[in-house]
Amino acid sequence: LPSGNEIGVRYSAQLFMGDGRGPEFEAISIDYARYNYYNIGFRTGLNLFFDDEVCDYYSIPMQFTWRTERIRGLVFPGDGEAGSWVAAALLSIIPKQFEAHTGFTPGMMLGPLSREPYSGNFLVKHRFSCTYDLGVRLIIPIWRFNLYGDFTYHCYLTDNFGFAYGDYRPGRSYMELGVGLSFNF
């Protein structure tokens, strides 16, 4: 498509990685991306996190992206048998475009600091947060719409979480798994 703008909505979960434990989040995101020459672009938006232990958490991703051209012409040369129809159906749902992104995501955790957690063991130590992000997006284009799966590694650069009981320090590495729908214009 000749246009280079994209707006989308995504649901995701951030899962703790590594040794020990850490709070896990669910998020709804609205984002905007602009692509220029050579499919290099910039993506930003608003992430709204939902978690009982952390309260309200909002962040704004600032990511540089690179996207491949759409892969066209994946057609299975079938002979009309049932097996060829199955192969054609499978080829129609594989991703036909890929994106790599990296950047930083500053955010703000609202609500009282160091309060007793609702349903867990973690306390918010500092309101401001910042993560370094590195990820890929697998895209299934449908006309001007994109269905996608998003896999992003986040490393918290700020020390935001404390353990309510003891001196244990939660890890800072998270893997975000998301699905979304975007529109190109």
What are these regions (language model features)?
Residues 7-12, 97, 103, 107, ...:
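Outer membrane beta-barrel transmembrane domains
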Residues 54-57, 132-185:
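Predominantly the C-terminal beta-signal and adjacent terminal strand-loop region
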Residues 5, 11, 26, 32-36, ...:
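Polar/charged side chains located within well-ordered beta-strands of beta-rich proteins
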Residues 11-15, 117-122, 161-164:
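Extracytoplasmic loops and strand-loop junctions of Gram-negative outer membrane beta-barrel proteins
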Residues 30-122, 126-132, 140-145:
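Gram-negative (and chloroplast) outer-membrane scaffold detector with strong preference
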Residues 1-49, 184:
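Short glycine/proline- and aromatic-enriched beta-strand/turn motifs that initiate or cap beta-hairpins
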Residues 10-12, 61-69, 180-184:
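Helix N-cap / beta->alpha transition motif
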